[in-house]
């Protein structure tokens, strides 16, 4: 399992998180001292099919055998489960902040909160919004660099505006529009390539053309749609 190393302070997230045995209210391994971590000790480590008492040894940016572990501090996980770091693939915000606010400080607060809940990687979602607001969001995402004790931003989910006006859910139907290769390309450039998922309603006019052209450039998610089986299969 890979390990995340923070180049700015040389602390390490082992790719594991701590959780108290009463629930996921403990701290993430990223919430540790800002030093090189050598080992997570004393916890019940999640394995192939069960938890077992054990240690997690670290060498730089990878999980290692004990004899190959690097020099550094040991984290005491006594009384905790030690699990693989969780990945949050779809959330809009937390702690009063939202990705669509396009706030650098807000995105850092979101990443810090997620890390404290055992989530070591995040892929937050934007809303259906006008072009200028989406550009601001993408610029904020493109410039983001996680700090110590924050979850890593591994990408983002563009949930709209290329959806069905009849299946908007909590989205604003005023800003729903046909999928645009030109617009998406501009947004992706602003996000520095961090848009990893884009929601598309394939039955809407022109959207199948978008899917055909862009499916090898970004992962397409069929969502907020009224498509029948045949249309979805074609997409």
Report each predicted region and the residues it spans.
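Histidine/acidic residue-rich metal-binding segments in metalloenzymes
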Residues: 177-235
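Metal-dependent catalytic neighborhoods of phosphoester/phosphodiester hydrolases
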Residues: 99, 132-142, 169
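Divalent metal-dependent hydrolysis catalytic cores, especially in the metallo-beta-lactamase
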Residues: 92, 108-137, 151-164, 191-203, ...
